[in-house]
Curated annotation (Swiss-Prot):
It catalyses: an N-acyl-L-alpha-aminoacyl-tRNA + H2O = an N-acyl-L-amino acid + a tRNA + H(+). This is Peptidyl-tRNA hydrolase. Belongs to the PTH family. InterPro entries: Pept_tRNA_hydro, Pept_tRNA_hydro_CS, Pept_tRNA_hydro_sf. GO terms for biological process: protein quality control for misfolded or incompletely synthesized proteins; rescue of stalled ribosome. GO terms for cellular component: cytoplasm. The record marks 9 as: Discriminates between blocked and unblocked aminoacyl-tRNA. It is an enzyme of class 3 (hydrolase). TRNA binds at residues 14, 60, 62, 108. It is found in: Cytoplasm. Hydrolyzes ribosome-free peptidyl-tRNAs (with 1 or more amino acids incorporated), which drop off the ribosome during protein synthesis, or as a result of ribosome stalling. Catalyzes the release of premature peptidyl moieties from peptidyl-tRNA molecules trapped in stalled 50S ribosomal subunits, and thus maintains levels of free tRNAs and 50S ribosomes.
Length: 187
């Protein structure tokens, strides 16, 4: 069993903000698989599809680890079978990469997942949102994408959803090789 969790903030107010790219990818996965997140736990909603769980916390970003831990414990999923999708300010808009482990940097949602799981040993799908040096980070990540920015991001979100679906039946190293290399070549 594998767990795929998109990080974001709940509510329509945050739907198309930079911090919610993880939620946007989960929405696309559900659309592609024709499923809904129809099961509830204390800290979020999820769907079970074949041999994996797709989930979104209903807590704010900084408390995302509660739901990841709740699902990992309930379904007995090891941290190395968890994939967390999140925004990455240190990647330019449209860049993305799969990574195994490592620190959470300044991303409070990822830091909370690390803290709650008590390990960095889980997979991440990082999606670049870029930075704006003239704006405080907390304001920037809660800003909605412009139409121009979203047109750059949309194909990346679609590809990320496809990668997550493939994660359910492929080795992560195979996906990293294929996806990260493809992104480097611009194909």
């Amino acid at each position: 069993m594998k767990l795929i969790v998109g990080l974001g903030n709940p509510g329509d107010k945050y739907k198309f903000t930079r911090h919610n790219v993880g939620f946007l990818v989960i929405d696309l996965i559900c659309q592609k698989l024709k499923i809904t997140l129809d099961k509830e736990k204390t800290h979020g909603s999820y769907a079970k599809f074949e041999d994996f769980i797709i989930a979104k916390p209903n807590t704010y970003m900084n408390l995302s680890g509660n739901f990841v831990l709740e699902l990992a414990n309930f379904f007995k999923i090891a941290p190395d079978d968890i994939l967390v999708i999140h925004d990455e300010k240190d990647f330019e808009l449209g860049k993305s990469a799969i990574k195994i482990g490592g620190s959470g940097g300044s991303h409070n949602g990822v830091l909370d997942v690390i803290n709650k799981l008590n390990t960095q040993n889980f997979k991440r799908l990082k999606i670049g949102i870029g930075q704006n040096q003239e704006m405080a980070l907390k304001d920037y990540v809660l800003q909605r994408f412009s139409l121009e920015e979203f047109s750059v991001l949309e194909p990346v979100l679609n590809q990320a959803a496809d990668v997550c679906i493939q994660y359910s039946f492929n080795d992560i190293h195979y996906l990293m090789n294929k996806y990260n290399q493809k992104k480097k070549n611009g194909n």
